[in-house]
From Swiss-Prot:
Coiled-coil segments on the chain, per record: none
Keyword Iron-sulfur applies: yes
Catalysed conversion reaction: isopentenyl diphosphate + 2 oxidized [2Fe-2S]-[ferredoxin] + H2O = (2E)-4-hydroxy-3-methylbut-2-enyl diphosphate + 2 reduced [2Fe-2S]-[ferredoxin] + 2 H(+); dimethylallyl diphosphate + 2 oxidized [2Fe-2S]-[ferredoxin] + H2O = (2E)-4-hydroxy-3-methylbut-2-enyl diphosphate + 2 reduced [2Fe-2S]-[ferredoxin] + 2 H(+)
Annotated source species: Synechococcus elongatus (strain ATCC 33912 / PCC 7942 / FACHB-805)
Binding site for isopentenyl diphosphate: 96, 185, 317-319, 379
Pathway the protein contributes to: Isoprenoid biosynthesis; dimethylallyl diphosphate biosynthesis; dimethylallyl diphosphate from (2E)-4-hydroxy-3-methylbutenyl diphosphate: step 1/1; Isoprenoid biosynthesis; isopentenyl diphosphate biosynthesis via DXP pathway; isopentenyl diphosphate from 1-deoxy-D-xylulose 5-phosphate: step 6/6
EC supergroup of this enzyme: oxidoreductase
EC identifiers of the protein: 1.17.7.4
Single GO biological process annotation from the record: isopentenyl diphosphate biosynthetic process, methylerythritol 4-phosphate pathway
Protein name as annotated: 4-hydroxy-3-methylbut-2-enyl diphosphate reductase
Necessary cofactors: [4Fe-4S] cluster
InterPro entries found in the cross-reference section: LytB/IspH
Cofactor annotation comment: Binds 1 [4Fe-4S] cluster per subunit.
Keywords: 4Fe-4S, Iron, Iron-sulfur, Isoprene biosynthesis, Metal-binding, Oxidoreductase
Length: 398
């Protein structure tokens, strides 16, 4: 499928919108009351620091809602204003934040039913409005919705669209796209749909395995057992790893994406030599600025003397998880929560340790003077961060 031609035709359709409906003023009040915070604004103006009693809060200097998320949520609110009577669907969570998605449900925005990973688009009728989330949607989903005669409102983050353009360049050059990401993450599913041939690697360990295979060959069946769910249909590691291009899920850890890119570059250089390297390897910077800024701010925060860190964001939020990883690497006690309600009653917290299920820790907050680091993922509203901070202050009074 010529994905570029399809996108061009879709963008010209009068049933497609990706710029909103000019109703920013109409929805600004609702957005401000639901998501903004005077307390957080005050923290920003006072060196990202706040002390009450024996608790000092130290807030990361880049955190929370990014521009792409703000844009997606605003367009979703505008869509309800523009189509007050129509049935509105969304193909997935608009962003990985439970409170934001709940607000959309309260606005009668319905979520496409999904069972065992399969979406049921039979519920969508001609003339319905369908919102594509900030992560984007696969080409196949867009094509299906277009054929159904739906009004498509596309809130895909422009940084994600940039990655799609990158993998289309890979395709035109007959390069396999090596995508650093989680193969079943919504964004990576969408990105891979624009590629002809692709392989998704989760981390540096998997990338090293692939590079060893490129240089030394190996057991093809073992390779496919390991990556069978993370590659394009008909993928052949003996054929499809001769020409590669690098892309990534925009929310991955910047340092790991860079390390993976350099590893593949060294591998192809070793195999084909400097004269032929450009024929066999393409590198593009598809790391999201907002993701990078939040990670850089977290690296700065963990250099301070902190007793613990609270990381706030959806449990399925990739960028939030990577912020937690930074705290763990520095051996700072960290607690990943998605809402203030996870704290209490009493000195108890329900949180999600890395790579495990939700757990409850009690007591979790040490006695005495404390300096607590706070950060949040790109899908977390300031209001949620405020609620967490206030809950922490409440604990010292209880």
């Amino acid at each position: 499928m010529d994905t570029k031609a399809f996108k061009r035709a879709l963008h010209q359709s009068d049933r497609y919108n990706r710029k909103g409906f000019g109703k920013t003023t109409d929805v600004s009040g609702a957005l401000e009351s639901a998501y903004q915070s005077d307390l957080i604004q005050s923290l920003r103006q006072n060196g990202y620091r706040l002390q009450r009693g024996e608790i000092t809060i130290r807030l990361a200097e880049a955190f929370g809602f990014c521009w792409g998320v703000e844009r997606a949520v605003a367009i979703a609110y505008e869509t309800r204003q523009h189509f007050p009577q129509e049935r509105i669907w969304i193909t997935n969570e608009i962003i990985h934040n439970p409170s934001v998605n709940q607000h959309l449900r309260e606005m009668s925005v319905e979520f496409i039913p999904c069972e065992r990973g399969e979406k049921d688009f039979s519920v969508v009728d001609r003339g319905d409005v369908v919102i594509l989330p900030a992560f984007g949607a696969s080409v196949q989903e867009m094509q299906l919705l277009d054929e159904k005669g739906c009004h498509i409102v596309d809130t895909t983050c422009p940084w994600v669209s940039k990655v799609w353009n990158t993998v289309e360049k890979h395709k035109r050059g007959a390069h396999t796209s090596i995508i650093h990401g989680k193969y079943n993450h919504e964004e990576t599913v969408a990105t891979s749909s624009f590629a002809e041939t692709y392989l998704v690697v989760l981390n540096l360990e998997q990338a090293q395995y692939v590079c060893d295979y490129i240089l030394n060959g190996g057991d093809r069946d073992e390779f496919m057992t390991r990556f069978g769910k993370a590659c394009s249909a008909g993928f052949d590691p003996d054929r499809d790893l001769e020409r590669i291009g690098i892309a990534n899920q925009t929310t991955m850890l910047k340092s790991e994406t860079e390390a993976i890119g350099k590893l593949f570059e060294r591998t192809l250089l070793k195999k084909y030599g400097p004269q032929a390297l450009n024929d066999h390897f393409l590198a593009f910077n598809t790391i999201c600025d907002a993701t990078q800024e939040r990670q850089d701010a977290m690296f700065q925060l963990v250099e301070e003397p902190l007793d613990l860190i609270v990381v706030i964001g959806g449990f399925n939020s990739s960028n939030t998880t990577h912020l937690q990883e930074i705290a763990i690497e520095r051996q700072i006690p960290s607690f990943h929560i998605d809402a203030a309600e996870r704290i209490g009653p009493g000195n108890r917290i329900e949180h999600k340790p890395l790579h495990t299920d939700l757990t409850t820790t009690e007591p979790w907050l040490p006695a005495g003077p404390l300096t607590i680091g706070i950060t949040s993922g790109a899908s977390t509203p300031d209001k949620v961060v405020e609620d967490v901070i206030e809950r922490l202050f409440d604990l010292q009074r209880s």
